[in-house]
Amino acid sequence: MVTSADDVSATLAQIRKHNISFTVRGGGHSTSGAASIEDGIVIDLSKMRKVTVDTQAKTVTAEGGTIWEDVDVEAAKYGLATVGGTVNHTGVGGLTLGGGYGYLTGKYGLTIDNLLSVQIVLASGEQVIASSTSNEDLFWAVCGAGQNFGVVTAFTFQAYDQKNQVFAGPLVFLPDKIPQIVEFANKFHKVNDGNQAMLMAFSAPPPANVPVVLCQLFYNGPEDEATAFFSDLYELGPIANMAAMIPYEKLNSLLNQGAGFDGRKQFGGGAFKLPLDPSLVVQIHAEFNAFVASHERMNGSMMLFEIIPYKKVIEVPNAKTSFANRGDYYNVATMFKWFNPAIDSEIRTFSRSLLKKTSETVASRSTDRGVGQYGNYATADVEANEIFGANVKRLEELKHKYDPDNLFRHGNRLIPRPLVVVN
């Protein structure tokens, strides 16, 4: 395990010298398995978890091995918060370098939109600072494709006042309420002001293993306003209601159980557009539930519709950062968990099929208006152009500049390509 940027530089020197395969582990939460490797070494940053808060500048600096719980808890001591994920044992590095959506995205944009600078160790072993005013082209690449360019040993984020508690937690419904829940989602799409979010999940969680629909609510404000905003859902009669006022630093722990570490995993992503046809969602749920029910020990699986407002996200042009998933749509993910390796291929095939059907609601995807594929949710078979769209050419040119030998290639898709100048 490394404990400093100097350790990372020294490790990379040995990797280059002896041509050793390697990967980098931040929080160890990689949905693609990129935080582990066979027949190679892991540059493990988990001993680098220091978080520093500058109360005057309202910034938070987190070392490369931090998880979001570290950031949330430390920032909260000063009444501050920044845009993190929705599960607090996710690594700061992985989520940030791939873009980063969270409950505060509706108000402040993506995690990378609030990233001020990084300290990064390049393939050469050189340690540099990248920001909007220093190594600007590298910073552009880091904001969406950072895993391809080096090991980030420190991140500095803009933080915001978050002294009030937030209203959050799940309402649980039986599947017969799906049409009405979808109608509310369609309404939410029109009336939210960025201070709200809703995650709709299909699952049949143990020990009951009964199919349910979970609606994870978020409202950055008082309880009376929150219950009024979500009143359509309350009127449906949830079978369980665990939503309440909680400290912000507890918010990102609410989904931790659904993102546990046991079993085999398949995580895939796509996009969907609102308004949704309720009958389509009913059909998708039926297919998901039938598949899960027909396999042993798969009840920890989930399909998640992330209704996180995108207005602030699309205020930033797709060419402004390497992240190319800025569009008028929302992310959807499948998270399958099982224990029998004999069905690995079957699960991957089914996941792709289900996501394809859902993503067909986004008919207007294009390389310059948002690709409809969140890189942090992408499986290994998704190509670079599908994630980075029109930005892929510049990324590959920068890859040639900063990592011409493709040292950072584990789990990544970019190929170093020299800039071609046409006279």
What are these regions (language model features)?
Residues 1-423:
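Soluble FAD-dependent oxygen oxidases
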